[in-house]
Design a protein with these regions (language model features):
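Short, Lys/Arg-enriched N-terminal segments with co-localized hydrophobic residues
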Residues: 1-2
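Sec-dependent N-terminal signal peptides
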Residues: 7-20
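Aromatic-residue-lined binding/catalytic grooves and analogous aromatic/hydrophobic interfacial grooves
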Residues: 23-210
Length: 210
């Protein structure tokens, strides 16, 4: 009877272990075999406090990026901007294409072109840094552009306030403030400065609590 009990325990353990052994996180990696038509077909990636949306469109590599806690005066969560990367020679003009999100290791791998150029994109989990690593059999020139749509104050329409704390009842003249963007040698610097008065102050005033 004791031997039968041990055999039963072993069989149960095997039944529990075998299904787990057959499952690998890499089996669920999203894989695309064609470039995207726009940002609505982007692939998420991130690490630590950094988040990205990555895609290839019309022969260019793009990604939006954001960081935890980047709220503006209206309590809207703002992306930092968009980065555009152009490669010469361009591997996206011909040959095969494959974009894969490596779930287990937390990075995106793009393989493109007749020579199977490899591009790896990931975020450092310990520092707010985004890495783009380009590998190929030939010398490749890389042109990187930073793009921002907050180059001036932008008046918000009523429906556009659903992304901030005003929702469907924004005050008249509400706007998203512009960023400060500058260039130092071969570097680009930018920041967003919130006004002294925020959505909290306006809410207190509206509710007569000031």
């Amino acid at each position: 009877r004791c031997m039968n009990l041990k055999q039963g325990i072993i069989i149960i353990c095997l039944l529990l272990v075998l299904p787990l052994y057959g499952q690998s996180l890499s089996d669920y990696n999203p894989i695309w075999n064609t470039p995207s038509k726009g940002s609505h077909e982007s692939m998420p990636c991130g690490g630590g406090s950094i988040g990205m949306n990555v895609w290839v469109e019309n022969g260019e590599l793009y990604f939006y990026f954001s960081r935890s806690g980047t709220f503006d005066a209206n309590n809207g969560f703002l992306k930092g901007g968009r980065v555009k990367i152009h490669l010469t020679p361009n591997p996206f003009e011909s040959g095969d294409f494959r974009q894969e999100l490596k779930l287990e290791d937390g990075y995106i791998e793009i393989t493109a072109g007749k020579e199977k150029n490899i591009i790896e994109i990931w975020a450092d989990v310990f520092h707010p840094v985004i890495h783009v690593d380009v590998k190929g059999s030939r010398k490749t020139d890389i042109e990187v552009s930073y793009e921002s749509w907050r180059y001036k104050n932008r008046l918000l329409r009523k429906d556009e306030s659903h992304f901030n704390s005003y929702k469907g009842n924004p005050p008249e003249g509400l706007f998203t403030a512009k960023d400060s963007i500058g260039f130092i040698d071969n570097q680009i610097g930018f920041c967003h400065r919130n006004a002294a008065e925020t959505v909290f102050d306006r809410t207190v005033e509206r509710q007569g609590l000031n």
